[in-house]
Amino acid sequence: MDKIIIKGAKEHNLKNLNIEIPKNKLVVITGLSGSGKSSLAFDTLYAEGQRRYVESLSSYARQFLGIMDKPKVESIEGLSPAISIDQKTTSKNPRSTVGTVTEIYDYLRLLYARVGTPYCPNCGIKIEKQSIDQIVDDIMKLEQGTKIQILGPVVREKKGEYKKIFEEYQKEGYVRARVDGETVELSDDIELDRKKKHTIEIIIDRLVIKEDIRARLTESVETALRIANNLVIVDVVGSEEKLYSANYACPKCGFSIEELTPRMFSFNNPMGACPECTGIGYLQKMDEDLLVPDKEATLYDGIKLYGSSTMKKGDTIAQMYFESIAKHYGVKIKGVKIKDLPRSFMEKIMYGTGDEEIDFVYKSSTGTHHNTAPFEGIIPTLERRHRDTKSAGMMQWYEMYMTEQECSACHGARLKPEVLAVKVGTLNIKELTDMPIRSIKEYLLSLELSEKEEMIASQIMQELSKRLQFLIDVGLDYLTLSRSAGTLSGGESQRIRLATQIGSGLTGVMYILDEPSIGLHQRDNNRLITTLKKLRDLGNSVIVVEHDTDTMYAADQVIDIGPGAGVHGGYVLAQGTAEEIAKSDNSITGKYLSGRMQIAVPKKRRNLTGKYLEIVGATEHNLKNVTVKFPLGNFICVTGVSGSGKSTLINDVLYKNIYKELNNSTMKVGKCKSLKGLHHIDKVINIDQSPIGRTPRSNPATYTGVFDLIRDIFATTNEAKMRGYQKGRFSFNVPGGRCEACNGDGIIKIEMNFLSDVYVPCEVCKGKRYNHETLEVKYKGKSIADVLDMTVEEAVTFFENVPRIKNKIQTLKEVGLGYIKLGQSSTTLSGGEAQRVKLATELSKTQTGKTLYILDEPTTGLHIDDVHRLVDILQKLVDKGNTVLTIEHNLDLIKTADYIVDLGPEGGVKGGQIIATGKPEKICKEPLSYTGQYLKDYLEI
């Protein structure tokens, strides 16, 4: 069958859809936000494809995979196994990096293990293999009379029971072994947990160093090397043991390293991970700036968290410490600001006096007392308290004053020094993964390997080159493999998974993607489209939910869903090529494609007001000492290719520095020399795409504050007054009015052993969240549950005569959210929808005209018609005297800006510079600006 046939799709707002989608083609599903695109692509096609695949597996396998609900659809024919690549960011696990997520790091570990050259971490000398004579000579250098054990490590950090190993070595005549550090008799019944990792070392011999033991020692070392894969451990009684390898050792200092294995290069394995930070690269430590936020205060008032309670004036224990230390070093502290105290003295206060003892003097009701002891230091004391506390609350409290600080042992490299001393060419594995992806590929291609190394590495190099190229093809050449996966944007993480899927080479699969072009500059769009076509050409069906016009024109077929959002959507308006859609009179998308409808370029752009916010000398991440002005009272767009430093400049430097100053916060901020012009604004609001709440209880009504007003209305009804119901009766968060069977959730979770957990409507309240008595109170014939079930559009009409409520809900409708329900769980809202709920909440507030609004890619998830509405709203905010600053790639929005700040020229280390600033027309004339080159077509210059 060469097509997927869907009959009677009714999931969410889909109106009994019947549609045929060609297989093994690139198909774009487009339409307004909330029109039903995701309902068709993800909740119908993907859900059913995944469900059928999982149902075919055993019940044992199903419990790990989880099964999806059967979508509301009569039938789907011709379905393939489905893989979804959505906007959800990759793992927040600090151990996940771009390298591990893409599996490129696995190939690099293999490369370093097979053709890496080890160097001594102490001397920097190339390490060669050790002969038996060299090993014996080194052992014989021990002092006469030293007791030693010779051991052969046969199992190192591997899971299993190993009963056969114990039996074999006992048969060979060995008597004892050391298992996980404990000496055991091989004749004993040794029980090991097969799920845990173990180390087993066979005890070969026990010796005392004398002149005449050389022959016996040589024989024992030979035996150990034979049974333990060229390794031998010499355990010196009363001292440290030493590992020798017949493979590699430093001729100068005697440092030896075992045979290189891929596990040694993994920071997730004890064999390679830095023991100090366990391979994470950083440690959570007390931050001096957070503990001493106010350097203008005195020592008594300025240090938080120290002493018997939170530090405050008159805290006698802390005062005694400080005064005694000050007396010891001859420093005056009374009435002196912290910033004026000697730094050497503050070092002693913060980090301790080491072995130096202080005469502590303190007074009590029984007289004056002396105690001589070193001072531990504020930071070591608080870190010890943090380690020792058993209270989750206290731990959380201490962590408010802690930050992630680079590990002092590995300096963020995550690996042991001996592993970092292994090089391929001139670089170790950390230095290589710190390079941008494009540079890594160039470096690997330029390597000069010997004939033998070439034979060993050729296949590994092919795989590496192929996978690196896939990442370059999807516009991610600026990323480094060492970048933490949790710091990637939704678009970046989706494109990484897309590149990984191409690398897997699967065929006959249905891929469903959610706006892969998000966060991608127009310059890189063609590479992404080529990648999607490559995935299709492998023999897969590629279905993309997308608003990008270039992708539509590149697709084999476009499906336009609409005509409106929510209840007004769910129909197929047009289906065919982009050229055919452009001719359709039913399709809003077609009207924009053909130019019959468009977002107009402003006839006149706002003039500069003479008021600016200025960042001076920003150097965070890849920013190259950037100094830039942002004109206030304007609509500003910050543009540039992916990875050029836009988010770093705006979110890390500008927003965090302003927020810290205006709110006296202890927030860690992006590095810059200074920030000027703050007196021109009274507040800064960052309207991002994070969820409006983390639990199903949070919803648009609670977030916007309209739910409080609605509960006030219900509390003033005659029925509520007669029953004595207060406002709290109409809350589903507290006992009283809520249904106690489901605690006001409206749903009950049922745990299934071999299936995913099932959520069913509460049988008592039928999903309405409230008890029967509360639901009897009606306003205009509707209960509180009925109101929460209304769409925004319905609620605007319902509360037409209550301006306070109507105005708040009206702003939700204005930002294109007329289709969402007032009580819709926040967990079901997309990032773009959550951002617009926040935007609507801000719009409904009284404007001061001195606010800076920051939005990071507000067009995410928006159809061009929704972008049209968004532009109108943002312009309204600026008309009231405010400043709107957006980070954006969408040229339809960029062309309406008053002022553009363009970063570049490239991404990553080649970015971080200001390429051009000014009105859009000026940017188009800048030859180095990629944004300007593409903007010309939109401004018809």
Q: Residues of each region from the PLM?
A:
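Conserved phosphate-binding elements of NTP-dependent enzyme cores
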Residues: M1-I941
